Amino acid sequence: IGSDEEVMRYSPQKIRLVNGIGSVRISPLRRQLFKNFKCKGYQFENVIHPSAIIANEVILSEGVQIMAGVIIQAGCQIEVNTIINTGSLVDHDCLIGQHVHIAPGVVLSGGVVVDENVHIGTGAVIIQGLRVGANSLVAAGAVVIQNILSDATVAGIPARELYRN
């Protein structure tokens, strides 16, 4: 469509937006764009690929993007501006916070809590009942078997903290 200024030529009551910015690690750009347009009264549409399977009892907040082959089981809640990418599995009773990017092929076992502004890399696995703290990065292929503190970067099998911001 063009620049942010061009979008703002349209009344917030006349259009709904889709956030086209992805994530390769924790980046404020996607979150900032969402918040900037929300402050101006714009609404964001959910985008759900037709091959995604989402249980009836799932709660999706505004601006959620669910890609091809994703399965989300009953009792899950997905907060605003979150991406669940291709082929990821989100089992029962997971809570995924705002501005999260779940990369392709991630597995979240039942009851996992992912706090806001987290990036979970391709193919990572998080076992049941764990929490991933806010602003954390889970590296591709990691297997998480214990809670992750906020602002941490973890990698490996099993996942170990590399550093904390």
Predicted segments, located by residue:
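Structural signal for interior beta-strand "rungs" in well-ordered beta-sheet cores
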Residues: 46-162
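Terminal amphipathic alpha-helical/low-complexity segments used for targeting or macromolecular assembly
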Residues: 1-47, 159
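Short glycine-/acidic-enriched loop or helix-start segments at secondary-structure transitions
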Residues: 28-30, 148, 164
